[in-house]
Amino acid sequence: MKAITLVGSTGSIGTQTLDIVTQYPDQFRIVGLAAGNNVEMLAAQIRQFRPKIAAICSEDKLPALKEAIIDLDPQPILLAGEAGVIEVARYGDAQTVVTGIVGCAGLLPTIAAIEAGKDIALANKETLIAGAPVVLPLVEKHGVKLLPADSEHSAIFQCLQGVPKSGLRKILLTASGGAFRDWDVERLADVTVADALKHPNWSMGRKITVDSATLMNKGLEVIEAHFLFGLDYDNIEIVIHPQSIIHSLIELQDTSVLAQLGWPDMRLPLLYALSWPDRIYTDWERLDLVKAGNLTFREPDHQKYPCMQLAYAVGKAGGSMPAVLNAANEQAVALFLDEKIRFLDIPRCIEWVCDRHQNDNRANPSLDDILAADKWARQEVLTATEKLETPSRIISLR
């Protein structure tokens, strides 16, 4: 039985991971849980899965959490704040830590888990995008496994099983196109938050659903794929695949193309990250190609999705620039969700901030450099919002 700690237990990734644990009680057990601020849900999870340790990031919610499980015996260790989440990530006998926290907030818990010798089921792409210069050397130093748990990188990882490293020629990341794949560019000026949250295929959290609408999600995945699989950016391609049945593809040196297919269900990549190298029988709906029907593909519209181009440029710039891109995107999306900026302001804010970082880009950033760049970028987005009257795009990193 594999012991698991789950960081980000009340979010979309967390609840789907716990669904897997519920279905396979002989395969997996929960050692630790950490969540953001949802006391009621975390308390219910503690009651059901009986972890040895749990943490809530919002320190003011700790008394309420203690009260909610006061009758439990034995009591788990209860912690709060960022330090508490980090302690959960490194705690005890967990073999694998699932990182389901949204955004760069997952970086420090992931580092703590790696340093404690835990394998990582990586569902938090921002950790690697911002922190790869620190995270990857630590993975090698401590001899842990870094297993992708999001659909696209899991698909690539699955396709690569048995393929020699020298055999990989190209990666093709599929994208649904998000909420606006069939909209004319001119309509994007009138996008509402409700519009952006209507993903056609996947059930995800609010932030990642907006990222899908801007295609920043796919741009970030390009950077993640570069770090995970070692390909140059010119050999990583995005293709729009509206049905979300093919989760990604690889092209080999002899022009053979391998793909991983399945219904759009995040539990599949999560289960594989937890069970690898084994395959566990499930009773989930099996893919019926006749039912799926036509599988279509098209090139992404670069005018509609400027965030995609930004991500490629930032990835090639390297250093601390990806941390700035990620933080600026998180801040801009948060402002959009709070209806403080418009949808089209998201890429403009990000581009403005990345441009201002070019002269300060650190080629080999330390953890302190990355955290400082993250903090700086979030503040700069607020400055950028004051300059949004300029009608044209502000800068070009290319």
From Swiss-Prot:
GO BP annotations, alphabetical order: isopentenyl diphosphate biosynthetic process, methylerythritol 4-phosphate pathway involved in terpenoid biosynthetic process
Reactions listed under catalytic activity: 2-C-methyl-D-erythritol 4-phosphate + NADP(+) = 1-deoxy-D-xylulose 5-phosphate + NADPH + H(+)
Glycoprotein among keywords: no
Database matches in Pfam families: DXP_redisom_C, DXP_reductoisom, DXPR_C
Pathway entry: Isoprenoid biosynthesis; isopentenyl diphosphate biosynthesis via DXP pathway; isopentenyl diphosphate from 1-deoxy-D-xylulose 5-phosphate: step 1/6
Annotated positions binding 1-deoxy-D-xylulose 5-phosphate: K125, S151, E152, S176, H199, S212, N217, K218, E221
Keywords: Isoprene biosynthesis, Manganese, Metal-binding, NADP, Oxidoreductase
Matching InterPro entries: DXP_reductoisomerase, DXP_reductoisomerase_C, DXP_reductoisomerase_N, DXPR_C, DXPR_C_sf, NAD(P)-bd_dom_sf
Binding site for NADPH: T10, G11, S12, I13, G36, N38, N124, E126, G205
Cofactor(s) of this protein: Mg(2+); Mn(2+)
Enzyme Commission number: 1.1.1.267
Family, per entry: Belongs to the DXR family.
Function: Catalyzes the NADPH-dependent rearrangement and reduction of 1-deoxy-D-xylulose-5-phosphate (DXP) to 2-C-methyl-D-erythritol 4-phosphate (MEP).
Cited PANTHER family: 1-DEOXY-D-XYLULOSE 5-PHOSPHATE REDUCTOISOMERASE, 1-DEOXY-D-XYLULOSE 5-PHOSPHATE REDUCTOISOMERASE, CHLOROPLASTIC
Protein name: 1-deoxy-D-xylulose 5-phosphate reductoisomerase
Organism per entry: Nostoc punctiforme (strain ATCC 29133 / PCC 73102)
